[in-house]
């Protein structure tokens, strides 16, 4: 059984419509990542889709992540546990760190090869989730 720590997660009964909206948002971001050849856009929307997938799966379990420092790490940890795949935490955290460098430290340029590998990784997470 997965433990949703109260300092990071709040128990919340989501309506099915809300969970469907989370899923549609995650799928929309994945579609954007798949439809462009701009590496930075592929990466950003792949990462966002992965986080939103985690938010949706956590919501299905009746929890909402608390919005505070480190909450993306907690989403990735739970996503990894829910899908029983340690690589999701490892690669997801690598994506998070690269995103943070890009966002907070003046940026970086991710090559096409790396961005497409991340996209394939995120697509595999969706498959593992049955989506």
Region roles according to the model:
Residues 1-131:
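Terminal alpha-helical segments
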């Amino acid at each position: 059984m997965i433990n949703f720590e109260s300092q990071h997660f709040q128990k919340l009964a989501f309506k099915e419509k809300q969970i469907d909206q989370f899923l549609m948002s995650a799928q929309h971001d994945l579609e954007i990542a798949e439809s462009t050849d701009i590496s930075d856009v592929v990466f950003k929307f792949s990462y966002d889709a992965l986080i939103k997938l985690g938010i949706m799966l956590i919501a299905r379990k009746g929890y909402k992540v608390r919005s505070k420092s480190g909450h993306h790490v907690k989403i990735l940890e739970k996503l990894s546990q829910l899908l029983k795949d340690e690589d999701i935490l490892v690669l997801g955290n690598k994506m998070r760190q690269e995103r943070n460098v890009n966002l907070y430290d003046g940026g970086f340029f991710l090559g096409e090869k790396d961005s497409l590998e991340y996209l394939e990784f995120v697509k595999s997470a969706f498959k593992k989730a049955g989506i």
